[in-house]
């Protein structure tokens, strides 16, 4: 069965633009949040898919702030979601609806966990000045208008004024993406959540573009203090279904980028790339993996994706081999360099002189071979899963660029050592991300930590 067999229920907690009140529907005799239904399922971070249903209810444009709740019933083929939004301008409520504050809502809720109770909680947060989320400022009322004004002013300064409205493209727990038309084509605004292993992406991309040229898009504008940047439209990503010969150019080009970056490690660190070299990864393995066995599970993990006790014990037992792999890999001549941290085909675009690499949120300095862990993960070419032969070709294309450092057999051994370490690097990254997420996204992303830890066990070298 396809998603077309599903039904999505969408509830809206609509906050007043300036007052600590929430919109409630009185037409049914009680108090209910505005709601809509639609066929299929919705992605909770896509304003273009979600906001039309709210526009039908309000008769006005609104800004999506965040997803508050999501659950699915596969048997009934039902998806239930709740979102927080705010109208672009203050206006009287639609017929049969009313703006209500915490006191009115609390009395109506009478201790029940229903629509009025949820609305009362949000109204209380607004009244107490807790609008938004410190890690994700775009969830606050008024943030969108500030960001849109900065974007417009930035484009005016470089002679490319906006020719239309700023639109939300993606709003979720990890980042916010806006788009706007200008006299020179569309531009993209991006900001990321505060997370311990995330970088100030605009600052880092300015540095990378200066050092590495066209392989990294240069931001048109950066607000370093607020973590905002604007990028030109560069035509979209490669996508997951492209011919193998196109994909082979990705590891080749990326290896050349890393070779150039290897001479600028201190500059990369000063720009804000995290230091995640092998000695740090070894320390994380030694401290974290045995603790996992003692805890018995991963925090914020959905029960279906918890590691088994046997897997946890195997990870703890693997620590000496992982430490040995770190030590042996450090003994190879390949130097530390720039690591992307999320290198896959959806973060690569076609450029005039070859692949261009974007989405540098996880950028760091580490062993360069760690990056190829993500290229191996479930990528499709022309609609078919990558076969072992093609993966070997991608490996060989990548390793050939490092031939000046080691003979082929030594490079192949370094690759073998790097596979479980790259998986561990990813597991550490996801652990850091999930620790700062709020429901319901934490439940969906937490499984990635377990996936990568299982990959550590699968890729351990002999």
Predicted regions and their residues:
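ATP-binding pocket architecture of kinase catalytic cores
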Residues: 32, 74-75, 79-111, 167-278, ...
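A short coil-to-beta-strand element that immediately follows conserved catalytic motifs
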Residues: 60-70, 161-168
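Conserved Nudix-box catalytic region and its N-terminal flanking loop in Nudix hydrolases
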Residues: 6-61, 69-72
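An alpha-helical support segment within catalytic cores of ATP-dependent transferases
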Residues: 142-161, 263-273, 277-339, 403-411
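Active-site activation/catalytic loop segments of kinase-like enzymes and analogous catalytic loops
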Residues: 355, 368-406, 420-439
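Helical subdomain adjoining the active site within ATP-dependent kinase catalytic cores
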Residues: 425-462
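Juxta-kinase regulatory segment immediately upstream of eukaryotic protein kinase catalytic domains
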Residues: 110-166
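Active-site acidic catalytic loop and adjacent metal/ATP-binding pocket
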Residues: 167-183, 188-189, 219, 320-372
